[in-house]
C-alpha cells in the first residue's frame, strides 16, 4: 500500500489549528477541481442536443438568387468559421451564422473549418446542418488540422506542449489560438459561430470590436495577411500564457496587445492607431452579455432597423444563451433575426423544432 507524501504527514501531525487549516486547503482545492469538471461537463455539452435528435440527414436546397459580382470595393477575402471540438453536427445558431455570412458576402469564400471532419477524399457526415450549409455555393466545409495551422508560428511549440496536459479551458483557448493564427497566415475575416451577420463586412480591414469600455473581443476579426498586430498577438499568447484564467488568452490578450500597440493605458484613450481600428460595442456587440435574455424578448418588427442601424453583425452570446428555447415564428428578437438574415435555417427551424 502506498504511503502518503511525507510533507502531508508532517502537516497532519501538526497542531490542531494547523491541521484544520491544512484540511481546509486540501478540501478547497479538491472542491475547486470537481467544480471545474462539473462546469465543463454542463457547459461543454451542447444544451440544444435534444433539438438535433430525429432530424433528417438531408434537406432540399432552396432556390438561390445568383450573386451579383461586386462593381467596386476591395478584393474580397475569405470568411472563416471554426469548430475546434470534434463536433460535426452544427446547431441552428451555427447554421444561421454561416448562412447569414454567405448571403451577405456572395462574392467571398465562406470556409467552415471543423476539427472533427475527416481529411482526404472522405465524404462529409450526413447531418441536417452539413446538408443545409452545402446548399450555398460559396460555403466550403473543410477539415481543421491544428498542427498544420500552427506550423511555422510561435504557437507550434505551445500546441505540442499542451497536448500532454489537462487544462480547464483548453477548448476555448484552442479557438483563441486558431483564430489569430488564421488571420496571420491567411488574412480575411473571422467570425464566431454565434454571430448573425447583417451587413457586408468587405470594407473592414485591420479591425476588431469593442465589447465594453474595458475590453476588446476577438469573436470578430478582420485583418490583412501577416499583419504585425496578429504577430504580436501570437507572441503574447505564448509569452504570457495562462490557461487557468477565463478569457486571458482571448479578449484580455487582444486588449493587452492593443494597449501596447497604441502605447495607451485605457481603451478610452484611442480607438485607432498605427493602422488598427476598434469599433464601438454597437458594431458587433449591441447587447452586452449581461443582457443576453433580451434576444428572447418580443420586439416590434418596425423597430428592428432602427435598433440595429449601426450594427454589422449581432453576437448572441451562445455561452449564456445556449439551450434557451424560443418559437421560430414568434416576435422574439432572435426569431426575427433568423427570419430576416438566415431564412433557409429559419424554415428548417419552423419545420423541425
From Swiss-Prot:
Its EC number is 2.4.1.228. Changing residue 251 to L: In p individuals; complete loss of activity. Ubiquitous. Highly expressed in kidney, heart, spleen, liver, testis and placenta. Its main location: Golgi. The chain crosses the membrane at residues 23-43. A motif (DXD motif) lies at residues 192-194. GO terms for molecular function: galactosyltransferase activity; lactosylceramide 4-alpha-galactosyltransferase activity; toxic substance binding. Catalyzes the transfer of galactose from UDP-alpha-D-galactose to lactosylceramide/beta-D-galactosyl-(1->4)-beta-D-glucosyl-(1<->1)-ceramide(d18:1(4E)) to produce globotriaosylceramide/globoside Gb3Cer (d18:1(4E)). Also able to transfer galactose to galactosylceramide/beta-D-Gal-(1<->1')-Cer. Globoside Gb3Cer is a glycosphingolipid of the globo serie, one of the major types of neutral root structures of glycosphingolipids, that constitute a significant portion of mammalian cell membranes. This is Lactosylceramide 4-alpha-galactosyltransferase. It comes from Homo sapiens. The gene is A4GALT.
Amino acid at each position: 500500500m502506498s504511503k502518503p507524501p511525507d510533507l502531508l504527514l508532517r502537516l497532519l501531525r501538526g497542531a490542531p489549528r494547523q491541521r484544520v487549516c491544512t484540511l481546509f486547503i486540501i478540501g478547497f482545492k479538491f472542491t475547486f477541481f470537481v467544480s471545474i469538471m462539473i462546469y465543463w461537463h454542463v457547459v461543454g455539452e451542447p444544451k440544444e442536443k435534444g433539438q438535433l435528435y430525429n432530424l433528417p440527414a438531408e434537406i432540399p436546397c432552396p432556390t438561390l438568387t445568383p450573386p451579383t459580382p461586386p462593381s467596386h470595393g476591395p478584393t474580397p477575402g475569405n470568411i472563416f468559421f471554426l469548430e475546434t471540438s470534434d463536433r460535426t453536427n452544427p446547431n441552428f445558431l451555427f447554421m444561421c451564422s454561416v448562412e447569414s455570412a454567405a448571403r451577405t458576402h456572395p462574392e467571398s469564400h465562406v470556409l467552415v473549418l471543423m476539427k472533427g471532419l475527416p481529411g482526404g477524399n472522405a465524404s462529409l457526415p450526413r447531418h441536417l446542418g452539413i446538408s443545409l450549409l452545402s446548399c450555398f455555393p460559396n460555403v466550403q466545409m473543410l477539415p481543421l488540422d491544428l498542427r498544420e495551422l500552427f506550423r511555422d508560428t510561435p504557437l507550434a511549440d505551445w500546441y505540442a506542449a499542451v497536448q500532454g496536459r489537462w487544462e480547464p479551458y483548453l477548448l476555448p483557448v484552442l479557438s483563441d489560438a486558431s483564430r489569430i493564427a488564421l488571420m496571420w497566415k491567411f488574412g480575411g475575416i473571422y467570425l464566431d459561430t454565434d454571430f448573425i451577420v447583417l451587413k457586408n463586412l468587405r470594407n473592414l480591414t485591420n479591425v476588431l470590436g469593442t465589447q465594453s469600455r474595458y475590453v476588446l473581443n476577438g469573436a470578430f476579426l478582420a485583418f490583412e495577411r501577416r499583419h504585425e498586430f496578429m504577430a504580436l498577438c501570437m507572441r503574447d499568447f505564448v509569452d504570457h500564457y495562462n490557461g487557468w484564467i477565463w478569457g486571458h488568452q482571448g479578449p484580455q490578450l487582444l486588449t493587452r496587445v492593443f494597449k501596447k500597440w497604441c502605447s495607451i493605458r485605457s481603451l478610452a484613450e484611442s480607438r485607432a492607431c498605427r493602422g488598427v481600428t476598434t469599433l464601438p460595442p454597437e458594431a458587433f456587440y449591441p447587447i452586452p452579455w449581461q443582457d443576453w435574455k433580451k434576444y428572447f424578448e418580443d420586439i416590434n418588427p418596425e423597430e428592428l432597423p432602427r435598433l440595429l442601424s449601426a450594427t454589422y453583425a449581432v453576437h448572441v452570446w451562445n455561452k449564456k444563451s445556449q439551450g434557451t428555447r424560443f418559437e421560430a415564428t414568434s416576435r422574439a428578437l432572435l426569431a426575427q433575426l433568423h427570419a430576416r438574415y438566415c431564412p433557409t435555417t429559419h424554415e428548417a427551424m419552423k419545420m423541425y423544432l
